Swiss-Prot record:
It comes from the Eukaryota. One of its GO terms (cellular component) is T cell receptor complex. The keyword Signal applies. Residues 21-109 form the Ig-like domain. The lineage of its organism: Eukaryota, Metazoa, Chordata, Craniata, Vertebrata. It is found in: Cell membrane. It holds the Pfam family V-set. Alpha-beta TR is a heterodimer composed of an alpha and beta chain; disulfide-linked. The alpha-beta TR is associated with the transmembrane signaling CD3 coreceptor proteins to form the TR-CD3 (TcR or TCR). The assembly of alpha-beta TR heterodimers with CD3 occurs in the endoplasmic reticulum where a single alpha-beta TR heterodimer associates with one CD3D-CD3E heterodimer, one CD3G-CD3E heterodimer and one CD247 homodimer forming a stable octameric structure. CD3D-CD3E and CD3G-CD3E heterodimers preferentially associate with TR alpha and TR beta chains, respectively. Residues 1-20 form the signal peptide. This is T cell receptor alpha variable 16. It comes from Homo sapiens (Human).
Length: 109
């Protein structure tokens, strides 16, 4: 079985007013086998009430919104739950597919 390559890029700093915000994604590159579960980690620091997003960019395509923390939907099999206690917004999918190969961006506003 050929591994599916899932790339992760970090959007590091966004500033609003005087409060500094930051998102971090520990994995810069992630390879998983087709059919295997995948989890892309996103941790954040923010002193207010965060709005978190996952964006995806497929090869030769524009950046598109995948998920927002308020939607609680499953899009293309992906889900993400906002955990304020752990300050995380991890993107998960139970079974990776070849078409999931893309760049994934976690963003904070």
């Amino acid at each position: 079985m050929k591994p599916t390559l899932i790339s992760v890029l970090v959007i590091i700093f966004i500033l609003r007013g005087t409060r500094a915000q930051r998102v971090t994604q520990p994995e810069k590159l992630l390879s998983v086998f087709k059919g295997a579960p995948v989890e892309l980690k996103c941790n954040y620091s923010y002193s207010g009430s965060p709005e978190l997003f996952w964006y995806v960019q497929y090869s030769r395509q524009r950046l598109q919104l995948l998920l927002r923390h308020i939607s609680r939907e499953s899009i293309k099999g992906f889900t993400a739950d906002l955990n304020k206690g752990e300050t995380s917004f991890h993107l998960k999918k139970p079974f990776a597919q070849e078409e999931d190969s893309a760049m994934y961006y976690c963003a904070l506003s």
